[in-house]
C-alpha cells in the first residue's frame, strides 16, 4: 500500500477530495484502539493469517498519529496567525486625523511651515501619535495622505473618516494648489489644458532640487523639456526618494552640529586640564 503524504493545512482545507482527514484527538485514539483489538483477535495474540492486516493497520495507525500531530500544530499556528495577523496597520485613523490637524495647528502656533521645519513639526505631534515613528515614516505618511486626498478632489469621499480627512487635506493643500492649477492649466482663450493630477502641484520641486544644477551642463532648457515628458509615475518615485534623502541630510547636519559642540567642549577641557598642570608645576 502506497504511503500518502500529508498536504499543508491550507491545501487540505481547499481540496475537498483529499484523502487525509484531520481527526479530533479522541476519535483518532478510539479508532487506533479498535484496530489493535480487531487484528489481535481480542485475545492479545497475533494470528499468523493476520500478519498482512497487522502491517496495514500499523501503517494506518502511523498515518492517524501523524495526522493528529500535524493537526494540533497547524491549529496552534492558525490561532497565532489569527491573534497576530501578518499585515498590521501602522497608522490608525486617529493618527491620520492628528497628523492633518497638527499640520494646520503647527503653522498657526509657530508661524512656520511644517514642510520647512520638519523636525519641529514632528516634535509638535509625536506625543499624540499612537506609536514611535521615524522621520522617514512621518514624511512618507504625509506624502501618502497628500496624494490620496488631492487626487480625488473632484469626487471627494463619502465615508465619515475619509470625508473628515479630505476636508482637512483641502484646507492644507486644496486652495493654494487649486489656484496654481487654474493659472497654469488654462490657455489664453480660457480653455483648460488636460494634465494629470499632481503634475502641476509640485511643478517646481525638480528645479529647486540638486538634480537640475547637477545636469545643467546638458542644457537647462533641454533638460526641462525632457523632464516634462517623463512618465508621472517615475516622477513621483523620484520625488518621494528625494524627500527621504533630504530628511537624512537634515539628520546628518544635526549630528554634525552636535559633534562640533562636543569637539569644542573637548578642546575646552583639554585647555583647563593643561592650565591646572601648569599651575601645579609653577
UniProtKB/Swiss-Prot annotation:
Q: From the UniProt record, list the coiled-coil ranges.
A: none
| Keywords associated with the record | Transcription, Transcription regulation
- Residue span of region Disordered: 33-73
One Pfam family this sequence matches: GeBP-like_DBD
Task: Set out the biological process GO terms recorded for this chain's protein.
Answer: regulation of DNA-templated transcription
User: Which top-level group of life is the source organism from?
Assistant: Eukaryota
Which family is it part of? Belongs to the GeBP family.
This protein is called what? Probable transcription factor At1g66420
Q: What organism is this sequence from?
A: Arabidopsis thaliana (Mouse-ear cress)
Amino acid at each position: 500500500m502506497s504511503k500518502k503524504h500529508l498536504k499543508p493545512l491550507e491545501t487540505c482545507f481547499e481540496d475537498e477530495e483529499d484523502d487525509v482527514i484531520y481527526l479530533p484527538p479522541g476519535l483518532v485514539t478510539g479508532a487506533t484502539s479498535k484496530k489493535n483489538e480487531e487484528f489481535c483477535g481480542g485475545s492479545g495474540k497475533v494470528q499468523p493469517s493476520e500478519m498482512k492486516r497487522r502491517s496495514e493497520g500499523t501503517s494506518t495507525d502511523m498515518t492517524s498519529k501523524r495526522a493528529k500531530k500535524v493537526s494540533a500544530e497547524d491549529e496552534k499556528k492558525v490561532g497565532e496567525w489569527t491573534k497576530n495577523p501578518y499585515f498590521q496597520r501602522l497608522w490608525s485613523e486617529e493618527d491620520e486625523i492628528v497628523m492633518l490637524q497638527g499640520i494646520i495647528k503647527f503653522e498657526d502656533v509657530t508661524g512656520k511651515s511644517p514642510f520647512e521645519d520638519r523636525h519641529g513639526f514632528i516634535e509638535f505631534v509625536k506625543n499624540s501619535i499612537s506609536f514611535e515613528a521615524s522621520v522617514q515614516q512621518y514624511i512618507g505618511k504625509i506624502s501618502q495622505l497628500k496624494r490620496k486626498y488631492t487626487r480625488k478632489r473632484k469626487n471627494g469621499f463619502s465615508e465619515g473618516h475619509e470625508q473628515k480627512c479630505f476636508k482637512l487635506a483641502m484646507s492644507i493643500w486644496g486652495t493654494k494648489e487649486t489656484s496654481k492649477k487654474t493659472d497654469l492649466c488654462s490657455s489664453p482663450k480660457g480653455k483648460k489644458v488636460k494634465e494629470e493630477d499632481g503634475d502641476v502641484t509640485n511643478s517646481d520641486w525638480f528645479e529647486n532640487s540638486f538634480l537640475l544644477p547637477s545636469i545643467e551642463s546638458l542644457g537647462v532648457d533641454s533638460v526641462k523639456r525632457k523632464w516634462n515628458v517623463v512618465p508621472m509615475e517615475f516622477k513621483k518615485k523620484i520625488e518621494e526618494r528625494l524627500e527621504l534623502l533630504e530628511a537624512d541630510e537634515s539628520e546628518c547636519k544635526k549630528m554634525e552640529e552636535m559633534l562640533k559642540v562636543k569637539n569644542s567642549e573637548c578642546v575646552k577641557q583639554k585647555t583647563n586640564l593643561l592650565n591646572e598642570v601648569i599651575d601645579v608645576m609653577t
